[in-house]
Amino acid sequence: MEGYLKDGLLTSSFCSPVRAFFNDADLIMKGKRSMAIFEGAGVAMITPMKANGEINYDKMAEFIDYQVDNGTDAIIVCGTTGEASTLSEKEHLDAIEFTVSHVNKRIPVIAGTGSNDTEYAVQLSQYAESVGVDGLLVITPYYNKTTQNGLIEHYKSISNSVSIPIILYNVPSRTGMNISPETCLELSKIKNIVGIKEASGNISQITKIASLCGDNLPIYSGNDDQILPILSLCGQGVISVLSNINPSL
């Protein structure tokens, strides 16, 4: 295995696609992999609701315990699957705080704090940091689309406002905004941007991100059906919807 990795296509800027399956100290990556919030499968958590439309915190507590007990590597609260875009501001903030409190440092908690309003994304991110999240998942601006340079400035503003790690979130099918590989390269130079959730579905683009950024921007699959190909491109893991149902897979 070691000889194959040295002599084959996977050079020092890449990693073994079987890294997640073998605990080989010789394959521990350098760069920002050492700063990664988690490795493996994090759950893009649903937000349980009561019939009257209020968040069901009793069920959320049960769900969090179920995830932790069955080996989930991280909890992602208020992401796309958690319907963050349809939560009120109070619901959004309360859900983040409750999750941090109930997880109680058993596994990392990552909060979705993105917005199409840069200042509001900064405020959400600062609040999430203040209540103790381990990292942030920050989607691109949506509806109000910007240029690639605008994206860089948007993420710089957020990253400069907090001290905790940030995972970029690229899902152009929902936002209408794509983070190009070249923009990923620029963003990877920012110290506390430590990964990207890539849900574009474009393996060619993901391959180019891996090639340009190497270990300075670990990639998480944002689509459950692309876990294997992304692992083969040295992916860090997955932020999974399927894990809501079966986190032990």
Could you describe each region identified by the protein language model?
Residues 174-249:
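Catalytic alpha/beta core domains of metabolic enzymes, predominantly
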